[in-house]
Swiss-Prot record:
Belongs to the Ves family. This is Protein Ves. It comes from the Bacteria. Pfam families: HutD. It comes from Escherichia coli O7:K1 (strain IAI39 / ExPEC). InterPro entries: RmlC-like_jellyroll, RmlC_Cupin_sf, Uncharacterised_HutD/Ves, Uncharacterised_Ves.
């Protein structure tokens, strides 16, 4: 289990100067050729998403105005807050900020032949599945994960195991990404 606080994470500026990324975790850890990766991006200007052949990307808008996503001949989609949207990461996708507002989004990328991610918003206590990896990011409220208290802009990631996230207040929202390994693959095989 790895814990993080977005406000204390290192920031990597994009080469095109249109934004920055905070990497939460990769699996396998510290590998450039990852099977899955979670990150938070701040987007300051219109531009294209980086290409990652063989990967799927699920992007969830956390803050800022809506973002218009366009992939020629594939889709046009308006990304709205807290509504995950998946697309192939090997296609050119242009992002256009609405009203010029900066936005922040959560990204999870998975290698299509190894694993698949599902992203959802939780508003109550839940328990994860034991054989799956995952990432949580607190949008608001106070959540208990084991002996750790997680609040706004904090989270955790894990590569397997069963974990219970308890909402400690009457209301709260948490982004949860679950990683499902495809048949013939498991975290034990790749570490």
């Amino acid at each position: 289990m790895e814990y993080f606080d977005m406000r204390k994470m290192s920031v990597n500026l994009w080469r095109n100067a249109a934004g920055e990324t905070r990497e939460i975790c990769t699996f396998p850890p510290a590998k450039r050729d990852f099977y899955w990766r979670a990150s938070i991006a701040s987007i300051a200007a219109n531009g294209e998403f980086s290409l990652f052949p063989g990967m799927e990307r699920i992007v969830t808008l956390l803050e800022g105005g809506e973002m218009f996503l366009e992939s020629t001949d594939r889709f046009n989609h308006t990304l709205k807050p807290l509504q995950p949207f998946a697309f192939a990461a090997d296609q050119v996708v242009k992002a256009k900020l609405t009203a010029g507002q900066m936005s922040m989004d959560f990204n999870i990328m998975t290698r299509l032949d190894v694993c698949k991610a599902k992203v959802r918003i939780a508003e109550r206590t839940f328990t994860t599945f034991g054989s799956r990896g995952g990432v949580v990011f607190v949008i608001n409220g106070a959540w208990q994960l084991g002996d750790k208290l997680l609040t706004t802009d904090q989270g955790a990631c894990w590569f397997d195991g069963r974990h219970t996230l308890r909402l400690l207040q009457p209301q709260g929202k948490l982004l949860f990404s679950e990683i499902n390994w495809l048949a013939g693959h498991s975290p034990d095989q790749v570490q």
